[in-house]
């Protein structure tokens, strides 16, 4: 099930974002910089995006496992918990996000994110 993110589940979304962000950036960011991306910091990051008109969604199966943000046609912040990747959840969340776009969908990914390129 995919649900909108609001204040009631923002910390859950931020925790997913934090864990997944750290894992995806570990190869090219310093350990000190990685560790600054705590759930509290990511909650503020996501809250600011929401306050500026971005819609956030969270994929919940038996537990919350993924997040994505949509701003008009821009899809960003697509993160799936590391132990839940390569099971189709990223594709499911991406397809949902495309359906939420009000402009031509564009997926923003890091240039070295090979897993995201496969989507």
Task: Give the ranges of each region predicted by the language model.
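A short beta-loop-alpha structural element at the N-terminal edge
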Residues: 1-15
């Amino acid at each position: 099930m995919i649900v909108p993110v609001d204040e009631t589940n923002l910390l859950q979304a931020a925790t997913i974002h934090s864990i997944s962000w750290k894992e995806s950036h570990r190869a090219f960011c310093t350990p000190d910089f990685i560790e600054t991306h705590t759930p509290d910091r990511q909650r503020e990051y996501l809250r600011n995006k929401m306050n500026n008109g971005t819609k956030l969604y969270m994929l919940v199966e038996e537990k919350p496992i993924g997040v994505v943000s949509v701003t008009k046609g821009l899809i960003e912040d697509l993160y799936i918990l590391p132990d839940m990747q390569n099971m189709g959840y990223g594709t499911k969340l991406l397809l949902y996000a495309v359906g939420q776009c009000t402009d031509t969908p564009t997926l923003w990914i890091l240039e070295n994110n090979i897993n995201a390129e496969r989507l």
